Amino acid sequence: MERPLDKVMTMILFGILKKGAARVTTREPLALEITDPLPEGLYAYETDFLAAFQKTDKVERQKALSEMVVSLIKSLTEKMKGFSRKETLEYYQSIMKTAWEQVEAANTPEVKSERYEQALEWTMLDKDYDDRTRDIFRTGPVFYPTWWWRFDPGHASAAGGGSIPAAIPGSRSAVPGADFAASVVNGIQNFSSN
């Protein structure tokens, strides 16, 4: 679906965080604490991504991330042999559309948040992801994804005083929808700029 590289990298990061393979220790510059042992079921590009973030030298990290991307593209090119590119794109567009429809159709903030968490990678494929996320979560409370504490270093340790309650890993805390949408979109933009 030819998305910008920064969006692809963010999708990989979120997938890794959802699987519990790492947590963000700082956002700028992005630093990860990698789980040991790694959880089962990671894709090769995910383990390559994590290996790149174990490198402390910025040039070495960039080189390792570049190699990961080249390897991922080669792998996808090989897997696409014999398939119609047009039909494949239409298929993934329909999955993305269905994912958004399920989020939008949810009747309660809890269900909407749960559906969004489940469909995050598919919704991120949307070129209008930023605006659509803001529109959908503009009003009402939103429950952070259960893995969000791995992405937002301040989220897990927020102790009173603010509008975001302290979070326990795996628990869900509610925030105003606009705040959540801004947090997701800004997190993606910040990661993309690193």
What are these model-predicted stretches?
Residues M1-N194:
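Acidic, Ser/Thr/Pro-rich intrinsically disordered cytosolic tails and loops
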